[in-house]
Amino acid sequence: MFISQICVAAQNCVSPKLTNAFAIFFSLLLFASTTLGATIVVPAGGSLQAAINSAAPGDTIVVDAGATYTGPFTLPLKSGDAYITIQSSRASEITGRVSPSQSGLLAKLRSNFGAEPVIKTAAGAHHYKLIGLEISTFTASDFIYDLVRLGNGDSSQSDLSTVPHHLILDRLWIHGFQSQELQRGISLNSAETTIINSYISEIHAIETDTQAICGWNGPGPYHIINNHIEGAAENIMFGGADPKIPNLVPSDIEIRGNLFFKPLSWKVGDPSYLGRRWTIKNLLELKNARRVTIDGNIFQNNWVEAQAGTPVVFTARNQDGNAPWSVVEDVTFTNNTVTNTQGGVSILRTSAESKGAITSRIRISNNVFEKIGLFDAFVLLNNPNDIQITHNTVFKGGNIITIDADPGTPKGTGLVIRDNLFSEGGYGVFGSGIGEGAPALEGYFSSYVYSKNNAAGREGFMYPVGNSFVLSSQVGFVDQAGGNYRLTSSSPFKNAGTDGKDIGVDVNELLAAQGTIAPAPTPTPTPTPTATPTPTPTPTPTPAPTPTPAPTQPASLQFTSSAYSVHENAGSVTLTVTRTGSTAGSASVTYSSLDVTASGFSDYTGLAGTLTFAAGESSKNVSIAIVNDTIVEGNETFNLILSGVSNANLGSPTVTTVTIVDNDKGRRVKIPRGGVTIERRKVR
């Protein structure tokens, strides 16, 4: 067996002194051996595109680790079903997921050719492997839409025959720069594609949605496994634009063992914030996707910015109105950890914005939700069908579940909430316009199961029988503070689930699915080494110094009160934010409203914005318009929340509750089950 080696460089690698006879022999040998797979070496300065063009199926193109190759590069269509491999000369030294610290082992592919991707596929290109490459632009000033483009999302790809397929991206570092604006790491509009062991970072822009990975015009299947994934708006999204291929739904998507991560240096007000306010939305969003397995991942860091901070969103959208077949269905979300976010999972069945698209058949099981902020663990909008929420352990600040629907929306069916452990915080299961507990479930779903859940600290009479309300401190976690959510042998929830398993998460199953993946550490400054002090002679006594004035306290921003009350006919309510401590220089804080029982559409005017304090200013007001309706609905509430700050700290309180005192009179209606009395069922 002969394996040939070709050198592709700036100069001819075959010496001109070779005799014609030897050259002919070499050519014949090359022809014979390439059928078995040639190794094509492209040293620094060589033409990688020429090597790609000349490669045959089965060939391996080796590029020098540490060398830079200038693109853009195109993977052309070739006949044959053996892979053409493009890999670093030191790829074998990288085991598992690559990291930026291994840059020296990677060959560097760069481009600054307008908005062209560094690597793209030709129509129908197939059977390529990319291994051990660093893919980026030359400088932070180079704007680019896609660093890697697999397939096309426009009308040039309007039927399945032109879709690239059988593509493998392995141990790649795909990245922008800290201050750079670019739209996508990988544009994923291909078929049969694997992205594995890679590191995608610094994908962000201002006032533009950006994604580390985004696909909308490829059929799948996709395998996204063991990657570090950073994207400002959405780390991964499927949908978001209408497919140009009729009836296409990205399908058979496997997302396993990844770290979905947003650096806190992107967060306004964090000590590590770098001063660029990127558009931040969520960590994973499905708008058009079918048969999706999301298993064994970690979702870390998401906050209020362009959206409410919910990290996982399932919301079917016929985005541009030309794809009424769009769906989000048959999604499994299992063995994941969601940590340090404002909420959990939001599921929207359909809406006017969805233009007919439907979300259904979602299973959320055996996950941990921890360090969840003031928003809700789960949000169900417009009554999605066949939703299962089972065996989760949830530590949250907001409601367990908030349910809401547009007027006239039919009730949902097949809701199952079972065998979960829910911490204190917020309300339990809350139905907008109805209240808490069984009435909320019955008001929005014609069939449901709510059993063997522990809703810590809630009132049992509001809920169906067969549930518990034990405080989290009495659940019997092995080490709640340390993050070990296994149950002790004496826990009342040990082996007490519907299936005979522990109520809440099976930690062993979760860790087995996550493997070696771990949350990213919180960055801490490198300590300055302390020099060994030089011995000093015994000092001569000196007079006591004049006392130094106490240092000026750093500025903090907070509401003057944690609660306000306003009559419905008052027209507006004014809330005051104060700056205490130093008032030198400017400072700012963002604010946003959050519905509790009041609606930002029909009861008050929902809002978000930024308060900026000039030097010397110590207070600012926020005025909120109140709607004076004629509906008998009882008192209703909403929150105003302070979040990102600049040149100050957040004080306390940062959340204030506004109660709108109803001024309408009418007949009270008694809801028999749960003993809840309301003025009128009001659906928004």
Q: Which residue stretches match the model-derived regions?
A:
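Acidic, glycine- and Ser/Thr-rich low-complexity intrinsically disordered tracts
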Residues: 59, 102-104, 112, 279, ...
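Ser/Thr-rich, Proline-interspersed low-complexity disordered segments
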Residues: 520-552
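Short glycine/acidic-rich loop motifs that flank beta-strands on beta-rich extracellular proteins
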Residues: 71-74, 98, 113-119, 138-148, ...
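Acidic Gly/Asp/Thr-rich repetitive segments characteristic of extracellular carbohydrate-active
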Residues: 38-74, 115-118, 491-495, 502, ...
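Bacterial N-terminal signal peptides
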Residues: 20-34
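Right-handed parallel beta-helix/beta-spiral solenoid domain characteristic of secreted/periplasmic
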Residues: 43, 69-70, 76-145, 171, ...
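Short boundary segments that mark the start of a structured unit
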Residues: 549-684
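Right-handed parallel beta-helix
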Residues: 87-88, 126-137, 161-176, 191-204, ...
